[in-house]
Curated annotation (Swiss-Prot):
It is a lipid-anchor. This is Adhesin MafA 1. Residues 282-313 are annotated as: Disordered. GO terms for cellular component: cell outer membrane. A lipid is attached at C15 (N-palmitoyl cysteine). A lipid is attached at C15 (S-diacylglycerol cysteine). GO terms for biological process: cell adhesion. Keywords: Cell adhesion, Cell outer membrane, Lipoprotein, Membrane, Palmitate, Signal, Virulence. Residues 282-298 have a biased composition (Polar residues).
């Protein structure tokens, strides 16, 4: 039984596979992070309902939230080394005997008919021999359990990757093409489509219990879109949202493993605030709603309603 208990820690020591999951997306993405970001963005774009734009020529405007940031996870993984540790020491009694050398000194004094003899014994201040005896038994017992992680995390400064925005824009254009909607320059479009990407990044978390541990990396893409007819200035697609998240998780037992690795893609929580409930003011008609028609592809024209209010009408 004792041999078995000794072999188990030896077999399990340093058993593990480390995946360097970063604390925040951006900069140089690694393979799993790329897969998650691509999956969440593809799922969100694929959910967009573009049926109202069938047969139209659309000018596409995509705006993405900035994703600059940094991550900080100090220290390694959770260890229960400090929770289970004990020791017992028993030292025997010891006694030491020292032997100091002695020597005699004799002095004789004579004066006329009188004489005296003086004899003295002295001991050196350094022992000539020492003898130590121990009595009793000596014993030492200790018990402990050490489970150390297979990785460590340090401060990271991560930069935004402009290619992510280009990648997402290309995905949206691909879906438009596959749906039969032509994407053209603004001067040739009869429809303006606005896509606002509020969330486009990764979230890392770690679960640490006494027996169960997990590393989780999520990628989320949340966007809102709407479409406007250039001639009538009416909404062809009212503001709608699409939100998806993908997840990669490694599960451990006492940080040994992982014994389970999983990947999932699912719909996530919607935007905390969206524009689906915004309606025109009561005195605003279809003819003087704000005009999204753009002459140079950059600056929007000023609608009739805005001009009237500026004149104080």
């Amino acid at each position: 039984m004792k041999i078995l208990l000794l072999l188990i820690p030896l077999v399990l020591t340093a058993c593990g596979t480390l995946t360097g999951i970063p604390a925040h997306g951006g900069g140089k993405r690694f393979a799993v992070e790329q897969e998650l970001v691509a999956a969440s963005s593809r799922a969100a774009v694929k959910e967009m309902d573009l049926s109202a734009l069938k047969g139209r020529k659309a000018a596409l405007y995509v705006s993405v939230m900035g994703d600059q940031g940094s991550g900080n996870i100090s220290g390694g993984r959770y260890s229960i080394d400090a929770l289970i540790r004990g020791g017992y020491h028993n030292n025997p009694e010891s006694a030491t005997q020292y032997s100091y050398p002695a020597y005699d000194t004799t002095a004789t004094t004579k004066s006329d008919a009188l004489s005296s003899v003086t004899t003295s014994t002295s001991v050196l201040n350094a022992p000539a021999a020492a003898l130590t005896r121990n009595s009793g038994r000596k014993g030492e017992r200790s018990a402990g359990l050490s489970v150390n992680g297979t990785g460590d995390y340090r401060n990271e400064t991560l930069l935004a990757n402009p290619r992510d925005v280009s990648f997402l824009t290309n995905l949206i254009q691909t879906v438009f093409y596959l749906r039969g909607i032509e994407v053209v320059p603004p001067e040739y479009a009869d429809t303006d489509v606005f896509v606002t990407v509020d969330v486009f990044g990764t979230v890392r978390s770690r679960t640490e219990l006494h027996l169960y541990n997990a590393e989780t990396l999520k990628a989320q893409t949340k966007l809102e879109y709407f479409a406007v007819d250039r001639d009538s200035r009416k909404l062809l697609i009212a503001p709608k949202t699409a939100a998806y998240e993908s997840q990669y998780q490694e599960q451990y037992a006492l940080w040994m493993g992982p014994y389970s690795v999983g990947k999932t893609v699912k719909a996530s929580d919607r935007l905390m605030v969206d524009f689906s409930d915004i309606t025109p003011y009561g005195d605003t008609t279809a003819q003087n709603r704000p005009d999204f028609k753009q002459n140079n592809g950059k600056n929007p024209d000023v609608g009739n309603e805005v001009i009237r209010r500026r004149k104080g009408g």
